[in-house]
Structures are given as C-alpha cells and as structure tokens.
C-alpha cells in the first residue's frame, strides 16, 4: 500500500512540474500586463483579457 501512495505522489509532483513549465492549465483573466506579472512566472503580456502564461 505504501508503494501505491508513493507512485501517486510522484505522479502528482511530476504533473505539477509540467504545468509550471508549460504555464497554468487554466485561463487567468487580467486587465493589464501588471496583473499577469503577479499571477504568472516570466512576466507574460495580457492578451484579449487573459494572461499569456504559456
């Protein structure tokens, strides 16, 4: 049973790392570029009301 939970934990950590590298898995609304710099890594621009985190 411990091995099963260890595998689940590894999968969760890896999926979170992939989301961090590729950007957020969901759209983040913004009004200005400053909103995105607080919510996304790498200071992405605000396009059409959403942050370009990818």
UniProtKB/Swiss-Prot annotation:
Cysteine-cysteine disulfides: 30-46, 36-51, 40-53
Any GO MF annotation of the entry: toxin activity
Keyword Heme: no
InterPro entries for the chain: Scorpion_toxin-like_sf
Tissue: Expressed by the venom gland.
Signal peptide annotation: 1-23
Superkingdom per UniProt: Eukaryota
Subcellular location: Secreted
Chief place of localization: secreted
Keyword terms: Calcium-activated potassium channel impairing toxin, Disulfide bond, Ion channel impairing toxin, Neurotoxin, Potassium channel impairing toxin, Secreted, Signal, Toxin, Voltage-gated potassium channel impairing toxin
Domains (record comment): Has the structural arrangement of an alpha-helix connected to a beta-sheet by disulfide bonds (CSalpha/beta).
Cited function: Inhibits potassium channels. May be active towards small conductance calcium-activated potassium channels (KCNN, SK), and less active towards voltage-gated potassium channels (Kv/KCN).
Protein family according to the UniProt entry: Belongs to the short scorpion toxin superfamily. Potassium channel inhibitor family. Alpha-KTx 14 subfamily.
Name of the protein this chain belongs to: Potassium channel toxin alpha-KTx 14.2
Organism: Olivierus martensii
């Amino acid at each position: 049973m411990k091995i099963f939970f260890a595998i689940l934990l590894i999968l969760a950590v890896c999926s979170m790392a992939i989301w961090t590298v590729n950007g957020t898995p969901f759209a983040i609304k913004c009004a200005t570029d400053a909103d995105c710099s607080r919510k996304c890594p790498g200071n992405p621009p605000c396009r059409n009301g959403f942050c370009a985190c990818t």
